[in-house]
Design a protein with these regions (language model features):
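N-terminal pre-ligand scaffold of iron-sulfur
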Residues: 1-66, 80-81, 95-111
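Short cysteine clusters
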Residues: 48, 72-75
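A short acidic, glycine-rich active-site loop
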Residues: 69
Length: 111
């Protein structure tokens, strides 16, 4: 088993906000999205299950206006933050692909 790969510092994700990240060697598209709620972080692949396109409106902006749901910038699909389940839109019933992570020493690591 390989060592966990660092993704970001916890402070890189605003509390009650989101940010996007890519790993070394990627083509600079945001490959992961992270949504923070206090000391809890939810990480998903930045890919809509409906079209496969990135979800962010602008780099790192994934949340609906009220911050309660993740919202796809292409067709307006909305997903629960806690589990990535689509509650409305063309992919209703599908889910975002969750990414396993851990928080350690103020950093977020991909497992």
């Amino acid at each position: 088993m390989s060592d966990p790969a660092p993704l970001c510092r916890l402070d890189d994700i605003p509390d009650r906000g989101s940010n996007g990240f890519y790993t070394d060697g990627a083509d600079r598209r945001l490959l992961y999205m992270a949504i923070r709620r206090g000391n809890e972080v939810f990480v998903y692949e930045n890919r809509c299950p409906h079209t496969g396109l990135p979800l962010d409106f602008q780099p790192g902006r994934f949340l609906a206006t009220d911050g309660a749901l993740i919202q796809c910038s292409n067709h307006g699909a909305q997903f629960r933050i806690k589990d990535g389940f689509c509650v409305s839109g063309p992919c209703q019933g599908d889910s975002l692909k969750a990414v396993k992570t851990e928080i350690r020493d103020g950093h977020l690591y991909l497992l």
